[in-house]
Amino acid sequence: MKGTLLLLALLVTGELGFQTTEACIPFYEAFGAVVLGNKQVLDVVLSKFNATDKEREAFEKIQECYNDGGLKSKLLDTRVVYEVTVNSPCKEYYTKDTILKVEDLLFQIQRHIMG
């Protein structure tokens, strides 16, 4: 399951012709919503991207996998995403302030997951 969402985001951005660095922030928004495990939060985030019914269904299935995987799965993948963030082209594309906001968001997700 590790990297599933990252792979999905990279495939989608490649398909749409976007630079992957431009898709970093939208990826973090979607990843955060999926990992939080709350369908309402996921719906709000997906609405920003005008997701189709099939796309919503796919993201809901990924969210179910994370929920089934439990706390350990969510924390491990959040840590992987953090490491990718601080060692990726995203870091060079966005300002330091934006990267700090993303890092803060990932830490907030971890705190929320841990209760």
Swiss-Prot record:
The keyword Transferase does not apply. It holds the Pfam family Feld-I_B. InterPro entries: CH2-like, Secretoglobin, Secretoglobin_Domain_sf, Secretoglobin_sf. One of its GO terms (cellular component) is extracellular space. It is found in: Secreted. Keywords: Secreted, Signal. It comes from the Eukaryota. Residues 1-23 form the signal peptide. Belongs to the secretoglobin family. This is Androgen-binding protein homolog. It comes from Mesocricetus auratus (Golden hamster).
